[in-house]
């Protein structure tokens, strides 16, 4: 990390610049690590530039069709068996719509190459060492680095064991409603024709989500941090590229939290990096194994119930003539509705009439309320055909079906476009320290940053071992007089040194010049009693050395020594508090339409309604003259089914009808409301730490930096009183006495006041993006979310493209009787048949079993699009199916689906633990020089440290010149 200098201490003498160090050897890059397990999907990064167009893939195989939904109508009375009609022709295959060209998918671009690292600037001279200032408040957290470029995806790891079945996701919103085609002419209803060829495969689903990113490589270990020099006074040089980050030391004991400083001004955004050239295209993946068909889908919503079709009177058996298709006759005038005649007796079946022209569709009738349940009456004679009723009101959705069996996971979809950037996650815990990476080239010295705020007072260090006595240095210039320091505690007297030998008596020297007046001595003593004047005695021996005086005031701070080697890392610090969750990010761009989900199991059929009361038997009426065609009356209630006559002869097969026109597109439906946000899953487990990498080479030593400013002058010590000159010549120097015992440590100085918090510096430029960490292990399956509320019906999607016709299937067995078709146009009136005897009402037969499902018939012409049904309630969430085997890759790629509406932004997930550090990436280009910060305020001087070890006893000084003769003594007593 970047070391923050403490407040400036008093300046010492300016040191000489040292020679620049030689660059260390370049380290080797470690071997690549083993590919990790595929990590869980990380947060979606920003959307990259589109790559060059890719090739279209192959069409996937069409899935098996699901079972048709069941519909239960009201139980009708059993009708007599109807005549078997002629077998109709197979419908012509519908025209295949033009498939829109699939948008080419671009190949991913390769990450841009980083620029060459710049030269490292010269290393600055070591500044004077200041006294430890009080610890400043903790600085505000720096801005997060820019997101690094994603590394190339790692190789696919081996497939893991199948996971536990997870919860089935909620049903997706219905797609936009497709345009309703124009209604074609109504065809003649014939017997079901033979199954036609299988329909063409539908267009391929939308591309799936992007694949998971490969595991990120481990971060390189930060290099060794250089010794921080204090800023010099010279002009700032050009900013070089940032040096490699130093090794992360173990966290120390957490200090007292500082007050939060004011937020600095927001810096200008850095220049945008140059976009790298696109990378090479990846290899084409192998074709996966074919997936198993999905489970049978749920039945669709029941269609609108059509009114009963008109039933013609059976004609007499006639000879089957050649079947010709007549041209449709002109529409007759609209007459007033006639009274309903009594139903006639059932006549003999007549010859099948010619096919009439299709009539225009009538309005939809409304479904009447169900009548009370009556007893089953015997079926009456057939009544006249009623007019087509209007379409009934949409029924209520049936009860929620039981949970379906878990479906097998489908094949992996084509990667979709990148989604929106999610909201900022919470700060994760600090990851394990990665292996040291190769050291980058030395960077130039940056401009002087703003002075930091004073830190808290540090704890006193342990007493160091006294070092060896250094060689005497050159005499420095006399310093300025400092402020008087605090007086230290007097140490114990040292042991007396050995007594020196008596010197030889010297010759009396010449009278010396008068010396300079001495400094004022100590306190004036009380005058003693005057003794008798003695005769001058002989020169005495040199006295013993007196006890050592008290320690002097602290001297001037010395020149700061060279930085020592970096100590071992301290213990790991306590983890920091978890940061608050960031604000939700803006909604991202509209994502691609997801692949259709698996079809669920059909739900149980709804309860049957009550049967209506049977109508009373009518009396046969007299045959009237045929009147004019009446106008279409209001929709009447459905009449009971009449008896069916014997089957007539099978007619010739008619020619196929003309191809219907393609319908026009209807208006799109309204957009549905967004669904509710899902619950946040639990955080995933911590990732394993990567193996430590080899140590990086030592970085080059920086060159000489600008000279630092001279600090304020220190406080000079008090001047001691000069000693009296000793008599006689200089004696030989005595031997060094033993070192005195270290004095007791002085009292703890008063803690200085807390310094003023410095003004915040301007915000620096945005640093280079950090290396992406590896993705953590996949998170555990979260609990299944509660079933969401039923959303409004979504818009109906546009009609899909018609696929190519499939192979012809075998003829299926006859299915259950279909719902009544629309009214056909009345055919030519046949000759009246002889009245048949009314048949006895037969008992209601049991419902027959459903026949075996036939093969898919030929694709018929596209019918008119029905109205969008009401969306059923969401079924219960089923368990998650096992992951299916990867299917073989199709021959060609499907068309791109339409882009769906943007979903609501999800709630921010909890930040997972940081993964192991990836390998060191290439060094980025140097950033532009930041604006210089404002000068910080000087901190208050720190407390006085404990007294140092006792110094050596000095050598005896030279003998001074003889003093002037004293005054004559008083006369002696007589």
Swiss-Prot record:
Residue positions where Phosphoserine is found in the record: 90, 584
What Pfam families does the annotation carry? Collagen (PF01391)
Glycosylation: which residues? 84
Bias type Pro residues, positions: 152-164, 637-649, 792-802, 828-844, 959-974
Post-translational modification, briefly? Contains mostly 4-hydroxyproline. Proline residues at the third position of the tripeptide repeating unit (G-X-Y) are hydroxylated in some or all of the chains.
UniProt entry keywords in alphabetical sequence: Extinct organism protein, Extracellular matrix, Glycoprotein, Hydroxylation, Phosphoprotein, Secreted
Question: Compositional bias (Gly residues) at which positions?
Answer: 303-312
Q: What is its main location?
A: secreted
Task: Indicate, by first and last residue, each region the UniProt record lists as having compositional bias (Basic and acidic residues).
Answer: 56-73, 880-894
InterPro entries cross-referenced by the UniProt entry:
Collagen (IPR008160), Collagen_superfamily (IPR050149)
3-hydroxyproline modification sites? Answer: 682, 946, 961, 964, 967
A cellular component annotation (GO) from this entry = extracellular space
Give all 4-hydroxyproline modified positions.
Answer: 17, 20, 23, 32, 35, 38, 53, 68, 75, 81, 108, 111, 117, 126, 132, 153, 162, 165, 192, 195, 207, 213, 222, 228, 231, 245, 254, 257, 269, 278, 293, 299, 308, 314, 328, 337, 343, 349, 358, 361, 370, 379, 385, 397, 406, 415, 418, 436, 454, 460, 466, 472, 484, 493, 505, 520, 527, 536, 554, 569, 575, 596, 602, 605, 614, 620, 638, 647, 656, 668, 674, 683, 692, 695, 716, 725, 733, 742, 760, 769, 772, 778, 793, 799, 805, 814, 820, 832, 835, 838, 905, 908, 926, 941, 947, 962, 965, 968, 971, 974
Q: Where is this region: Disordered?
A: 1-974
Give the UniProt tissue specificity note: Expressed in bones.
Compositional bias segments (type: Low complexity): 1-14, 25-44, 98-114, 132-150, 198-228, 352-378, 387-406, 504-517, 581-595, 608-635, 664-680, 709-718, 730-742, 804-826, 865-879, 908-941
Carrying 5-hydroxylysine, the residues are 84, 248, 323, 548, 659, 829, 883
Q: Where in the cell is the protein located?
A: Secreted; Secreted, Extracellular space; Secreted, Extracellular space, Extracellular matrix
Query: Quaternary arrangement and interactors, per the entry?
Result: Trimers of one alpha 2(I) and two alpha 1(I) chains.
General function of this protein: Type I collagen is a member of group I collagen (fibrillar forming collagen).
The entry sums up its family as follows:
Belongs to the fibrillar collagen family.
Q: What else is known?
A: These protein fragments were extracted from an ancient femur bone collected at Cueva Rosello in Peru.
What this protein is called in its record is: Collagen alpha-1(I) chain
Which taxonomic lineage does the organism of this UniProt entry have? Eukaryota, Metazoa, Chordata, Craniata, Vertebrata
């Amino acid at each position: 990390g970047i070391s923050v200098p403490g407040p400036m201490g008093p300046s010492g003498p300016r040191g000489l610049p040292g020679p620049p160090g030689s660059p260390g050897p370049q380290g080797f890059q470690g071997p690549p690590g083993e590919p990790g397990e595929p990590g869980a999907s990380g947060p979606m990064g920003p959307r990259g530039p589109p790559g060059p167009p890719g090739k279209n893939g192959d069409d996937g195989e069409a899935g098996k069709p699901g079972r048709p939904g069941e519909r239960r109508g009201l139980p009708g009375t059993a009708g007599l068996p109807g005549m078997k009609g002629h077998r109709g022709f197979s419908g012509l295959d519908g025209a295949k719509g033009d498939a829109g060209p699939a948008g080419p998918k671009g190949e991913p671009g390769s990450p841009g190459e980083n620029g060459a690292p710049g030269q490292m600037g010269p290393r600055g001279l070591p500044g004077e060492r200041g006294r430890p200032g009080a610890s400043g408040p903790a600085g505000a957290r720096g801005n997060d680095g820019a997101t690094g470029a994603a590394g190339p995806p790692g190789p696919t790891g081996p497939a893991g064991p199948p996971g536990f079945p997870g919860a089935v996701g909620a049903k997706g919103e219905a797609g936009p409603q497709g345009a309703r085609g124009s209604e074609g002419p109504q065809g003649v209803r014939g017997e079901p024709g033979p199954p036609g060829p299988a329909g063409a495969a539908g267009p391929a689903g939308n591309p799936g989500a992007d694949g998971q990113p490969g595991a990120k490589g481990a971060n390189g270990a930060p290099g060794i941090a250089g010794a921080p020099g204090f800023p010099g006074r010279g002009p700032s040089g050009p900013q070089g590229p940032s040096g490699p980050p130093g090794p992360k030391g173990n966290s120390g004991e957490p200090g007292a939290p500082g007050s939060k400083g004011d937020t600095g001004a927001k810096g200008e955004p850095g220049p945008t990096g140059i976009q790298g050239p696109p990378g090479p295209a990846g290899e084409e993946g192998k074709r996966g194994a074919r997936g198993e068909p999905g489970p049978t889908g749920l039945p669709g919503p029941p269609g609108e119930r059509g009114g009963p079709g008109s039933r013609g009177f059976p004609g007499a058996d006639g000879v089957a003539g050649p079947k010709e298709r007549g041209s449709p006759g002109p529409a007759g005038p609209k007459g007033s509705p006639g009274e309903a005649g009594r139903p006639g007796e059932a006549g003999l079946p007549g010859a099948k009439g010619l096919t009439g022209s299709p009539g225009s569709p009538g309005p939809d009738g409304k479904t009447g309320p169900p009548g009370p349940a009556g007893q089953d009456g015997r079926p009456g004679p057939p009544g006249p055909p009623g007019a087509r009723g209007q379409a009934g009101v949409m029924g209520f959705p049936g009860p929620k079906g039981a949970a379906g069996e878990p479906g097998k996971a489908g094949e992996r979809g084509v990667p979709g476009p990148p989604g929106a950037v999610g909201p900022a996650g919470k700060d994760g815990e600090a990851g394990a320290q990665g292996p040291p990476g190769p050291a980058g080239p030395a960077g130039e010295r940056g401009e002087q940053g703003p002075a930091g705020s004073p830190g808290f007072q540090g704890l006193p260090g342990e007493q160091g071992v006294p070092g060896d006595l250094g060689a005497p240095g050159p005499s420095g210039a006399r310093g300025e007089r400092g402020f008087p320091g605090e007086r230290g505690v007097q140490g114990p007297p040292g042991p007396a040194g050995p007594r020196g030998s008596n010197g030889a008596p010297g010759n009396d020297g010449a009278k010396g010049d008068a010396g300079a007046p001495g400094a004022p001595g100590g306190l004036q003593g009380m005058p003693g009693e005057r003794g008798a004047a003695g005769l001058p005695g002989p020169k005495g021996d040199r006295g013993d050395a007196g006890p050592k005086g008290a320690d002097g005031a602290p001297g001037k701070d010395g020149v700061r020594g060279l930085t020592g080697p970096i100590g071992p890392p301290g213990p790991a610090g306590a983890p920091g508090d978890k940061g608050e969750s960031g604000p939700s990010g803006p909604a991202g761009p509209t994502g691609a339409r997801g692949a259709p989900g698996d079809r669920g199991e059909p739900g149980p059929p709804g309860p049957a309604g009550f049967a209506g009361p049977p109508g009373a038997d009518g009396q046969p009426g007299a045959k009237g003259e045929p009147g004019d065609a009446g106008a279409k009356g209001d929709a009447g209630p459905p009449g009971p089914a009449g008896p069916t006559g014997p089957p007539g002869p099978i007619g010739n097969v008619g020619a196929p009808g003309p191809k219907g026109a393609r319908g026009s597109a209807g208006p799109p439906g309204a957009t549905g409301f967004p669904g509710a946000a899902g619950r946040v899953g639990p955080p995933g487990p911590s990732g394993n730490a990567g193996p430590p990498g080899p140590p990086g080479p030592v970085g080059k030593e920086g060159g000489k930096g600008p000279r630092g400013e001279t600090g304020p002058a220190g406080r000079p010590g008090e001047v001691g009183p000069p000693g009296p000159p000793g008599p006689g010549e200089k004696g030989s120097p005595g031997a060094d006495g033993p070192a005195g015992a270290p004095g007791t440590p002085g009292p703890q100085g008063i803690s200085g006041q807390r310094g003023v918090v410095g003004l915040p510096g301007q915000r620096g430029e945005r640093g280079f993006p950090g290396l992406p960490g590896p993705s953590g292990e996949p998170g555990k399956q979260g609990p299944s979310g509660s079933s969401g509320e039923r959303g409004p019906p979504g818009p109906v999607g546009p009609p899909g493209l018609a696929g190519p016709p499939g192979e012809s299937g075998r003829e299926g067995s006859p299915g259950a009787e279909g719902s009544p078709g629309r009214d056909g146009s009345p055919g030519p009136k046949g000759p009246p048949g002889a009245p048949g005897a009314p048949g006895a009402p037969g008992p209601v037969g049991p419902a027959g079993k459903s026949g075996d499902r036939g093969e898919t018939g030929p694709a018929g012409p596209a019918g008119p699009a029905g109205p969008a049904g009401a969306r059923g309630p969401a079924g219960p969430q089923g368990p998650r199916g096992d992951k299916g085997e990867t299917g073989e890759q199709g021959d060609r790629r499907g068309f791109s689906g339409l882009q769906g509406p943007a979903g609501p932004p999800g709630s921010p997930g909890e930040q997972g633990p940081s993964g192991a550090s990836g390998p060191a990436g290439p060094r980025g280009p140097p950033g532009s020089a930041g604006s210089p910060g404002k000068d910080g305020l000087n901190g208050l001087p720190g407390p006085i440290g404990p007294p140092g070890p006792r110094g050596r006893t000095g050598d005896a000084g030279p003998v001074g010149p003889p003093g002037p003769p004293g005054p004559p003594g008083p006369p002696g007593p007589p």
